[in-house]
């Protein structure tokens, strides 16, 4: 039985939230009791430091707030909450939102167009999300909007823009870059063969290194059984960077407990 220390020792600055209910999603099912408690402590601090801002009539309740915080803190469970410095607000739309996008083509002409976005993040600025896609981030499908945007934030700690190479030791950069680009090429080869819609990894990962890191971070936490065997070298680099092994958690969860001479209970 899990002992929930926040039930008796919550801070006055933050009312107790329904953490047990918030933890009851497939994405977090493999966490040990100790990991769950650590994640909740980080999430409490996250909600004390960041402001969740509902937009366009979206109603934010305690359970939604708790689950959003848990997903933000899962990638930094071992890195530490300071890795999420650099922003103070999370803006939440009820559904994907329209933004004005400006881009420059190959000959230098600047174009403007309105595009639909699921989420956005900048180095210094808020993270923007939408609730419809957040809800789809609770399972173990390989899609996770919050982890995707958090990965961009972690990536940008290494410079002014996301590059696909997070803040790692200099001696590891060349190997990381090699393995990441190899993964991009592999994903693109599959897209060329079967098409974007049939690809086993989100085709967005093949667009550039920053998106590859963000997309594969989604798979790292929510579909490790797809990531690890396909890109074993890059998987080990992700495990080392995040300080976690979601595939091991998945295997432990799926392995029946044996005791009393091998009898399954």
Curated annotation (Swiss-Prot):
Highest taxon, organism lineage: Bacteria
Cofactor field: Zn(2+)
Keywords for this protein: Aminopeptidase, Cytoplasm, Hydrolase, Metal-binding, Metalloprotease, Protease, Zinc
Co-factor remark: Binds 1 zinc ion per subunit.
Enzyme class: hydrolase
Binding site for Zn(2+): 111, 148, 152, 211
PANTHER family, alphabetized: MTFA PEPTIDASE, PROTEIN MTFA
Summary of the function given for this chain in its UniProt record: Involved in the modulation of the activity of the glucose-phosphotransferase system (glucose-PTS). Interacts with the transcriptional repressor Mlc, preventing its interaction with DNA and leading to the modulation of expression of genes regulated by Mlc, including ptsG, which encodes the PTS system glucose-specific EIICB component. Shows zinc-dependent metallopeptidase activity.
UniProt similarity note: Belongs to the MtfA family.
Name of the protein in question: Mlc titration factor A
């Amino acid at each position: 039985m899990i002992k929930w220390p926040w039930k008796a020792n919550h801070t006055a600055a933050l009312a107790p939230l329904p953490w047990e209910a918030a933890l009851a999603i497939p994405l977090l099912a493999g966490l040990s009791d100790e990991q769950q408690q650590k994640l909740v402590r980080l999430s409490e601090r996250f909600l004390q430091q960041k402001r969740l801002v509902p937009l366009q009539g979206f109603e934010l309740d305690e359970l939604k707030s708790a689950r959003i915080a848990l997903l933000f803190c899962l990638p930094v469970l071992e890195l530490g909450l300071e890795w999420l410095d650099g922003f103070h607000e999370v803006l939440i739309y009820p559904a994907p939102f329209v933004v004005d996008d400006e881009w420059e083509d190959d000959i230098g002409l600047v174009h403007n167009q309105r595009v639909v976005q699921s989420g956005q993040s900048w180095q210094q600025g808020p993270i923007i999300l939408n609730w419809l896609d957040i809800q789809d981030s609770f399972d173990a499908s390989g899609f996770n909007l919050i982890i995707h945007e958090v990965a961009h934030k972690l990536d940008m700690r290494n410079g002014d823009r996301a590059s696909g190479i997070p803040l790692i030791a200099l001696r590891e950069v060349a190997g990381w870059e090699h393995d990441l680009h190899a993964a991009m090429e592999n994903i693109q080869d599959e897209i060329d063969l079967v098409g974007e819609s049939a690809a086993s990894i989100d085709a967005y990962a093949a667009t550039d290194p920053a998106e590859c890191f963000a997309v594969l971070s989604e798979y790292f936490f929510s579909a490790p059984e797809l990531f690890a065997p396909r890109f074993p070298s890059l998987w080990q680099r992700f495990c080392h960077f995040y300080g976690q092994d979601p595939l091991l958690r998945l295997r432990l969860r799926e392995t029946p407990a044996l005791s009393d001479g091998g009898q399954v209970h």
